[in-house]
Amino acid sequence: MVLLYSQASWDQRSKADALVLPFWMKNSKAQEAAVVDEDYKLVYQNALSNFSGKKGETAFLFGNDHTKEQKIVLLGLGKSEEVSGTTVLEAYAQATTVLRKAKCKTVNILFPTISQLRFSVEEFLTNLAAGVLSLNYNYPTYHKVDTSLPFLEKVTVMGIVSKVGDKIFRKEESLFEGVYLTRDLVNTNADEVTPEKLAAVAKGLAGEFASLDVKILDRKAILKEKMGLLAAVAKGAAVEPRFIVLDYQGKPKSKDRTVLIGKGVTFDSGGLDLKPGKAMITMKEDMAGAATVLGIFSALASLELPINVTGIIPATENAIGSAAYKMGDVYVGMTGLSVEIGSTDAEGRLILADAISYALKYCNPTRIIDFATLTGAMVVSLGESVAGFFANNDVLARDLAEASSETGEALWRMPLVEKYDQALHSDIADMKNIGSNRAGSITAALFLQRFLEDNPVAWAHLDIAGTAYHEKEELPYPKYATGFGVRCLIHYMEKFLSK
């Protein structure tokens, strides 16, 4: 995918369907953010009476015989002193939606004068590119006649030296290939995206990139490894479980290793603790953690980062059936820790627990980061725009938070309240898989933390239940799967681990 280009000269630009012109807002009025020809000023001067330049505001106009582009979009960037990476990202995402609805395929974007801003040309370009790429996406549909919006096919940013712009654009395009993979997997029917399909995608990545190796464990191998928690969740499903291990060696001589774990429940009925219909209808997205890990590995291998990363995906359906695991029963995990089942709808933490145990036994991790659509309690706490995360290591937490703020993928650190751990007490097992009806996201994280046992490994748990999937478009994300987490984690690993 090559979509974005840069060009220093305004006069030498190619003809395009549309032109995007940037504006600041000053004293509640629009102020030009770049110098343009008088021919264009004549087109938009009357429109400025109803256009203030506030962030994300757009005005769609038609050109004339004197303009090279016949469609013109005025784009508000807000007050220059308040512009941030996130506002740039969301503004150009909004512009992309407007352009696609107008059926534009080729677009010229005039780069604003930003010498007075607090961040660099590179940062502005990165967020501009991310905004365009994020909304230049269609989720899979099954209509007889395709009703999807046409894609932008070529976007040229003018006023930027190609050597600078094109390097940033190629990187963002590689990154968004991973984001799109994550979105497509989450958006596709659960009948298609089974555990075996996730394994096939992992194999496909390993076939595409020589730096990746893959290992797939089937049910027999899962039982041989004594992953009794994953095996329990898989008991009721007609589809076979898989335990997927991806390995990326970007720095073979280094002992530093990051393990990424993604919850891969390809459909969650709740098991015998059956979900109500309204809560179940979106449960094809319960494998978003697994999809996030696969998207990260796609980008990681494409960008060739000099780090070592292992990805682990425990994958199964949580189905109902005569063989399904039952509430009140006790199952034993890989390391011998036993769990009393208080709810079969708290299955994600069970399969993640066996994945954590596997990572500690075989991968010698420096840090473990897991991704899971784990708790509705997190959605209640932070909504759909912010993912909560837990960490047992302040450096890891600080670095993730910084990467989050620099990519616009919002994370908020949540507390691991030690005294809440007692809510997991069981009289007949080492623990229950649910606590009380309070602090649900915290007790879920405390459950996972127990499986670190005495290992001092740095660990973070990202509960992406609210951010992975939106039932309406929310900038800078499209409707449905967002791909949240791919950009943040790649940026984290590049900035803090690629040394």
UniProtKB/Swiss-Prot annotation:
Binding, Mn(2+) 1: 268, 345, 347
Enzyme Commission no: 3.4.11.1, 3.4.11.10
Binding site residues for Mn(2+) 2: 263, 268, 286, 347
Cofactor binding, per record: Binds 2 manganese ions per subunit.
GO cellular component: cytoplasm
One Pfam family hit: Peptidase_M17_N
InterPro entries for the chain: Leucine_aapep/pepB (IPR011356), Macro_dom-like (IPR043472), Peptidase_M17_C (IPR000819), Peptidase_M17_leu_NH2_pept (IPR023042), Peptidase_M17_N (IPR008283)
Active site, UniProt feature: 275, 349
Subcellular location per the Swiss-Prot or TrEMBL entry: Cytoplasm
Necessary cofactors: Mn(2+)
Gene3D superfamilies assigned to the protein according to its UniProt record, in alphabetical order: Leucine Aminopeptidase, subunit E, domain 1 (3.40.220.10), Zn peptidases (3.40.630.10)
One Gene Ontology molecular-function label: manganese ion binding
NCBIfam families the record matches: PRK00913.2-5, PRK00913.3-5
Record HAMAP family: Cytosol_peptidase_M17
Name of this chain's protein: Probable cytosol aminopeptidase
Species of the source: Chlamydia trachomatis serovar L2 (strain ATCC VR-902B / DSM 19102 / 434/Bu)
Lineage summary: Bacteria, Pseudomonadati, Chlamydiota, Chlamydiia, Chlamydiales
Name of encoding gene: pepA
